């Protein structure tokens, strides 16, 4: 999506270790007008699927998942990284590794909010190694829910997460596909 690529070029910052900082408009300060456009783009790509639920992982995926929930007119569920007294033990659980944080998390979703009747669109801000998505897919599998598709804002195609998931048969739509970085700029895939 050209609009997202232009915004990345304008406000994104390339950090050492192949990290793209987009906190000026995606994952710290949020541009709601841009997010509405991004949600509309995901809707166009997945409108023919039977989506009745959107699933993401906290924290950075929540904002775009929420915008998509409005556009798809369906509930949004997010996998929590921390347990609470209100969540209880009746949860689907899995472990995910965060590339950015360089650590593993146990994530969980209450069994109240996901089951075999659900046709799920997975939404996240980044796809690199694919570990967060593998965790969400595992949670859907535990719930016997159907993964209808995966929507990603920014995919680092030089890392193999997207390729591996596509090989497993998942439909992934990434709005910006990055094939690499130079010292201070982003190289997008054509």
Curated annotation (Swiss-Prot):
- What positions does the entry give for xanthine binding? 20, 27, 156
Q: What EC designation does it have?
A: 2.4.2.22
* GO process terms (BP): purine ribonucleoside salvage; xanthine metabolic process; XMP salvage
One GO cellular component term of this record is: cytoplasm
The record's SUPFAM superfamilies line, in alphabetical order, gives:
PRTase-like (SSF53271)
- UniProt xrefs under InterPro entries: PRibTrfase_dom, PRTase-like, Pur/Pyrimidine_PRTase, Xanthine_PRibTrfase
Supply the alphabetized keyword list: Cytoplasm, Glycosyltransferase, Purine salvage, Transferase
Top-rank taxon: Bacteria
**Could you tell me where this protein is found in the cell?**
Cytoplasm
Q: Recall the GO molecular function terms of this protein's record.
A: xanthine phosphoribosyltransferase activity
Q: Where does the protein principally reside?
A: cytoplasm
Catalytic activity field: XMP + diphosphate = xanthine + 5-phospho-alpha-D-ribose 1-diphosphate
Pathway-wise, it operates in: Purine metabolism; XMP biosynthesis via salvage pathway; XMP from xanthine: step 1/1
Per the UniProt record, one Pfam family is Pribosyltran
Q: Where does 5-phospho-alpha-D-ribose 1-diphosphate bind?
A: 128-132
Q: Which family does it belong to?
A: Belongs to the purine/pyrimidine phosphoribosyltransferase family. Xpt subfamily.
Q: What does this protein do?
A: Converts the preformed base xanthine, a product of nucleic acid breakdown, to xanthosine 5'-monophosphate (XMP), so it can be reused for RNA or DNA synthesis.
Q: How does it assemble?
A: Homodimer.
**Entry protein name:** Xanthine phosphoribosyltransferase
Q: What is the lineage of its organism?
A: Bacteria, Bacillati, Bacillota, Tissierellia, Tissierellales
């Amino acid at each position: 999506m050209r609009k997202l690529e232009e915004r990345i070029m304008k406000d994104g910052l390339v950090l050492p270790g192949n990290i793209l900082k987009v906190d000026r408009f995606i994952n710290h300060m949020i541009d709601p007008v841009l997010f509405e456009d991004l949600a509309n783009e995901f809707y166009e790509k997945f409108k023919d699927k039977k989506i009745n639920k959107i699933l993401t992982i906290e924290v950075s995926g929540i904002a775009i998942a929420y915008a998509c929930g409005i556009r798809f007119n369906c509930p949004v569920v997010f996998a929590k990284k921390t347990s609470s007294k209100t969540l209880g033990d009746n949860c689907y659980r899995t472990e995910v590794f965060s590339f950015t944080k360089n650590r593993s998390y146990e994530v969980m979703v209450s069994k109240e909010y996901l089951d075999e009747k659900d046709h799920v669109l997975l939404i996240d801000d980044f796809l690199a190694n694919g570990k967060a998505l593998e965790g969400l897919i595992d949670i859907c599998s535990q719930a016997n829910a159907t993964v209808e598709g995966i929507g990603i804002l920014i995919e680092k195609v030089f890392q193999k997460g997207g390729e591996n998931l596509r090989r497993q048969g998942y439909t992934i739509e990434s709005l910006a596909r990055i094939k690499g970085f130079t010292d201070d700029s982003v190289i997008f895939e054509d």
